[in-house]
A protein has these predicted regions:
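Membrane-interface junctions at the ends of membrane-embedded or membrane-associated helices
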Residues: 1-4, 72-85, 141-152, 257-258, ...
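Start-transfer (signal-anchor) and selected internal transmembrane alpha helices
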Residues: 1-15, 71, 75-99, 123-173
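Transmembrane catalytic cores of multi-pass membrane glycosyltransferases
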Residues: 10-66, 169-219, 227-243, 250, ...
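Transmembrane alpha-helix segments characteristic
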Residues: 89-104, 270, 452-475
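Hydrophobic/aromatic-rich transmembrane helices and adjacent perimembrane loops
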Residues: 119-133, 340, 479-526
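Extracytoplasmic
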Residues: 123-126, 337, 387-395, 537-701
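Transmembrane-helix signature of polytopic, membrane-embedded enzymes
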Residues: 251-280, 315-320, 399-400
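Signature aromatic-anchored transmembrane alpha helix within multi-pass, membrane-resident enzymes
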Residues: 372, 376-380, 453-454, 507-558
């Protein structure tokens, strides 16, 4: 009863504090913004100071309040024991389950992503019948997993099936050319990920020649692509598939280590994989999240798994030094997700020491100090590495504006931030809170007794890890609150509900055993059994949903082959060949002109798909400028004109979109620069980046 009171009071306090924070003004200096941000972007700037405060403050405050209320209600229970009877506990436990059930119904009926939307988005329109059938079908395997004693055989079967799924996903994903599609959403988001890699591969430097929103991953990718044979679409597909398979492997290994029931582990991990990295149903490949932002939290899961199974203290010490370097590497890859990895790892180390030594031990405080120091060291190694690579490539150093360009643009300026509405995120947060609700009471009990923890460390360590990853990764949705953006976190909830089933099952068995004993407590045991069964049913429905999605994706791929839903998004309108795209037409036009009219010299491409065109024509990026896809500031737009002025002896190609923005942002600067050139040719092209015909203007120096 103490824990239920603590949970309710913590939630109520957080809701009240969150409501008060909603009145915090943004205090944005729009006059200053107008001086530096281009009009198109300024119209989409929606700074969310209040929402950011709510997220950061309440994420930290909730567990603190929970633990504080536990200690408060413990003292109250000694003075007023009638407030904390077993009967009241059974009532409030049922009320909690009832509230969660009502919230699920409301979200599926009234939210920004209702049942019909989710049904079509994930379940091919089959919906609830498939969910229920899947939930029923996995009851027997779960029961069998709890009964079997042949652990070695289970492990072998587990990894054979996991390997088959990982190979299946790799083959399907690695066969795709992400440029060869007429789906603008897919190509546009892929291009934002790809062009920095191509630019780095041709000798350009992040922060000097261009700014990259998503971090310094291009340096790592270029190194891998060189091993594969170079920066091209075939190797890029292999790289993406490899990263996604690594993420899937991390989910499988984490589940194998921390689930006792290996069948349940396989079901949860498979559901997580197909709801996240192996989303092979529709064209929802958002490369900026899977694999870019998801890889570091996944690596954190595998690092924690390995550390957990290591028993030798010396091996653990060496491994934790290695982990410090790994997470510095993660920060270098992508700072936003890298910092989540650093926090999760530090939290895990502290939790392990709390389990080992209790809360009164100096060892715990030493562990906290070490975790802070190693986290700072990881950040320092990241910053030093960035500066060394930049200086080695360009002979210059870069500052915070270049290192944290994406963070300062989006979170700092509020670009494309959206208010959070009533949606699925509520259910995902409930899963995170449920994970902490399993852990925090047991930690509080151990702290009160002044002893080291003697409970189920395996289950609770996993729940803690997933909850911290979930709350950390939720920051992405807080900023970019598109209804579907929160779907990238469903995999965390799937793994959590699997672990919750494993935790609830022994409780249910205990209550059923008590029901068989004839005494006055049978009604209470029955009430507890009903509540626990309801929790398990809710969790089973989530697992049923994830399992049905995985099954339908695999069946669709196996049954329909090259005509599967997934494959159809890579079929060009022209049907000429699998790798054909309309971008090839533009590249051919530019190549033909340069050979006939420009002595074979590649013009500077100040166009939207510049990296693709240069790749097709086997040319390097021969100018330093910010790509149109990342134009946020006036200075970004001016980089096109700057490169025209820097070298007045070379031809250049510019498109309608760029000219429109340049004319709006710096018309005089453009007119002055273009005086040194004459228009040589106009290419008209049906561009996938905008409906209708686009024009591409080829300018040559006047002396030519």
């Amino acid at each position: 009863m103490i824990y239920i009171y603590s949970l309710y009071y913590s939630v109520i306090c957080c809701v009240f504090i969150g409501y008060l924070l909603s009145f915090v003004p943004n205090n944005v200096d729009l006059a200053q913004y107008k001086q530096i941000i281009i009009p198109e972007v300024l119209a989409e700037c929606k700074p969310e100071r209040a929402e950011n405060l709510q997220y950061y403050l309440l994420t930290i405050l909730f567990p603190v309040l929970y633990l504080c209320f536990i200690f408060v209600f413990r003292k109250i229970s000694k003075k007023s024991p009638m407030m904390f009877t077993e009967k009241k506990y059974s009532i409030w436990e049922f009320v909690s389950v009832f509230i969660v059930g009502i919230l699920i119904i409301l979200v599926l009926k009234k939210s920004d992503t209702p049942y019909d939307y989710i049904n079509n988005y994930y379940c091919y329109g089959y919906g609830l019948p498939i969910w229920l059938l899947s939930a029923l079908l996995i009851v027997f395997p779960l029961w069998l997993g709890n009964k079997t004693r042949r652990k070695t055989l289970c492990g072998i079967i587990y990894w054979m099936l996991a390997a088959a799924i990982l190979v299946f996903a790799f083959v399907r994903i690695s066969s795709k050319n992400y440029m060869a599609t007429d789906d603008y959403y897919l190509t546009h988001h892929y291009y934002a990920w790809w062009y920095p890699i191509f630019k780095v591969s041709t000798g350009q430097t992040i922060g000097i020649d261009f700014n990259n929103i998503y971090g310094f991953y291009p340096y790592i990718c270029v190194g891998v692509l060189k091993l594969l044979g170079g920066a091209n679409q075939e190797n890029a597909a292999i790289l993406i598939a490899s990263l996604l398979v690594i993420i899937g492997f991390c989910y499988y290994l984490f589940s194998f280590v921390f689930f006792k029931n290996k069948i349940l582990a396989f079901i949860a991990a498979t559901g997580a994989c197909f709801l996240a990295p192996f989303d092979l149903f529709k064209n929802r490949f958002y490369i900026q999240y899977f694999p870019t932002r998801a890889i570091v939290p996944a690596v954190a899961m595998i690092m924690i798994s390995v550390d957990y199974i290591l028993k030798n203290n010396k091996a653990k010490s060496f491994f934790r030094v290695f982990a410090c370097l790994v997470f510095a590497f993660g920060l270098f890859w992508n700072f936003e997700s890298g910092i989540i990895g650093v926090i999760v790892w530090a939290g895990y180390i502290i939790l392990e020491k709390a389990f080992d030594y209790g809360f009164d031990s100096k060892n715990l405080w030493m562990a906290i100090a070490k975790a802070i120091v190693t986290s700072v060291l990881s950040i320092a190694v990241f910053l030093i590495t960035v500066e060394i690579i930049t200086y080695q490539r360009a002979g210059k150093l870069i500052g915070k504006d270049e290192i944290f360009f994406g963070i300062l643009t989006f979170e700092g300026k509020g670009f494309f931030l959206l208010p959070i509405t009533f949606g699925v995120w509520i259910l995902i947060i409930i899963s995170f809170v449920s994970a902490l609700n399993m852990l925090l009471p047991k930690l509080a009990l151990a702290a009160e007794k002044g002893k080291k923890f003697d409970g189920d460390r395996q289950n609770l360590t996993a729940l803690f890890t997933l909850a911290i990853i979930g709350f950390g990764a939720f920051s992405y949705f807080v900023g970019r609150s598109y209804p579907t953006n929160v779907f990238v976190l469903i995999y965390v909830s799937v793994l959590i509900v699997g672990l919750l089933i494993e935790a609830y099952y022994p409780q249910l068995k205990e209550q059923i055993t008590l029901l068989k004993v004839k005494n006055n407590n049978r009604k209470l045991s029955a009430a507890h059994a009903v509540s626990i069964s309801s929790k398990i049913i809710i969790c089973m429905l989530v697992l049923g949903f994830s399992t049905s999605n995985a099954a339908m994706i695999m069946l669709d791929s196996l049954k329909n082959g090259a005509n599967s839903t997934f494959d159809n998004y890579w079929v060009s309108d022209t049907k000429k060949d699998p790798d054909y795209t309309r971008i090839n037409e533009l590249a051919g036009e530019i190549k033909s002109w340069s050979e006939k009219e420009n002595d074979g010299k590649n013009p500077r491409l100040l166009i939207y798909w510049a990296a693709f065109v240069n790749e097709i024509n086997h040319e390097k990026t021969n100018y330093s400028a910010c790509e149109q896809i990342d134009w946020f500031y006036y200075d970004n737009v001016k980089t096109y004109v700057d490169c025209i002025n820097d070298d007045k002896t070379q031809a250049f190609v510019i498109d309608t979109q760029a000219l429109s923005k340049i004319s709006e942002c710096c018309p005089d600067y453009w007119q002055e620069a273009v005086k040194n050139y004459r228009l040589a040719k106009v290419i008209k092209w049906d561009d996938i980046s905008a409906p209708g015909e686009q024009e591409y203007y080829i300018f040559v120096p006047i002396q030519k």
